[in-house]
A protein has these predicted regions:
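Short catalytic-loop micro-motif centered on adjacent basic/acidic residues
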Residues: 117-120, 188, 291-293
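A gly/proline- and charged-residue-enriched helix-loop-helix capping module
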Residues: 82-114
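Short amphipathic alpha-helical segments
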Residues: 1, 85-87, 185
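Active-site/acyl-donor-binding loops of N-acyltransferases
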Residues: 5, 129-162, 240, 287-340
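A conserved beta-strand-loop-helix scaffold within acyl/acetyltransferase catalytic domains
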Residues: 3-60, 64-76, 122-150, 156-268
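ATP-hydrolysis module of ASCE/P-loop NTPase motor domains
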Residues: 111-127
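Aromatic (often tryptophan-rich) hydrophobic motifs at membrane interfaces
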Residues: 58, 97-108, 206-328
Length: 340
């Protein structure tokens, strides 16, 4: 098996069919492995800030896998920056052989150009993380570190929506859901338009005013517009007294829903963050969705939804011993401060 490097847009476009075929055969996958996500994120968001590095594993005329990578900030990393939730190589068979080839190539390139290899959000589900652990055992200055918890709700564990509601806390039902139901707050799925986006940005800005490190959603506008029009990304909103007061943007992929971006305004005592999730879960039952994945952050409010919790890991190969020591010291200090 050999490796071919793809570093130009037109060649990236040519990969769509083979990429999709492999994705369809993968047992553990997410929307962040699709060609649509990777191409559009790179093209619309990252392409001026990074160097494209798609690796294609092939044998003769047959293509067996892809590594969706970029070189950015002196690191080799997955496409998606900090805004994707599950990282993985694109391969369905001969995975160990393919991932070993990918690692050999990126390690050689990293050594030649003094780059770090930083692969984030590798899920513990499936076998890719285990394969990568074995591969990097003999690679100097490497580490595998638990990065973040994820939360997901398997709807097949309950007989129906009513049965699921009995599993969540009575406090959540009484304080968060019932008041919103009585207030006749409207949940709807909408298609992208500029007026809708302006309301989404306003809701997000309103929420950010309560937080440290204020940000905006301007980075998300082009990718949300494109993927919504492509049918991969849905936009849901809550309306109260004719005004949009909450939004929840989610991927619909391979029988599962993946919550990606959400925010809400402060309206009286309504707990709109909870209610918009309630509405999405109710819709999921009607649409025969199998899993509602709340993705990063197994916070208490997500556990209230009777979610299953798993973990994502980061794999880093540092260009020097000193950089590894500096990073591990920083993480230990950060954890100490958080616990304190």
């Amino acid at each position: 098996m050999e490796i071919r490097v793809i570093d130009q847009e037109e060649k990236f476009c040519d990969l769509k069919e083979n990429w999709g075929t492999i994705i369809n055969n993968m047992k553990v996958k997410s929307p962040f492995q699709t060609w649509d996500w990777n191409y559009n994120w790179w093209y619309l968001v990252e392409n001026r800030e990074c160097e494209l590095l798609i690796l294609e594993a092939f044998e003769g005329k047959d293509v067996f896998g892809f590594a969706p990578l970029v070189i950015k900030n002196k690191s080799i990393e997955f496409i998606g920056d900090k805004h994707f939730d599950y990282g993985a190589f694109i391969c369905a068979e001969r995975k160990r052989e393919i991932i070993q080839l990918f690692f050999k190539h990126v390690c050689d390139l990293a050594k030649k150009r003094s780059l770090d290899i930083v692969l984030k959000c590798l899920p513990e589900k499936g076998d890719q993380l285990g394969i990568i652990r074995e591969i990097i055992e003999d690679i100097p200055h490497s580490l595998v570190r638990k990065q973040v918890d994820t939360a997901n709700l398997n709807l097949e564990e309950y007989q129906n929506f009513e049965g699921y509601l009995k599993a969540i806390s009575s406090s959540l039902r009484k304080k968060a859901i019932k008041p919103c139901l009585k207030a006749d707050i409207e949940f709807q799925i909408e298609m992208y338009n500029d007026d809708l986006w302006n309301d989404i940005a306003d809701i997000y800005d309103d929420r950010q005013s309560d937080r440290i490190g204020v940000s905006t959603l301007e980075w998300a506008r082009p990718i949300v517009k494109t993927l919504n029009q492509a049918g991969l990304l849905n936009i849901s909103t809550l309306k109260y007294e004719g005004n949009r007061v909450s939004f929840l943007i989610f991927f619909e992929f391979s029988g599962n829903d993946y919550i990606w971006l959400t925010a809400f305004k402060k309206i009286g005592k309504f707990q709109l963050g909870h209610y918009v999730r309630y509405c999405l879960i109710e819709r999921a039952y009607k649409k025969n969705v199998v899993v509602v994945d709340m993705m990063r952050g197994a916070y208490d409010y997500k556990k209230q939804w009777d979610c299953n919790v798993s973990s994502n890991y980061e794999v880093i190969v540092f260009s020097s011993w000193w950089k590894k020591m500096k990073y591990t010291s920083y993480q230990k200090g950060r954890k100490f401060i958080r616990n304190f």
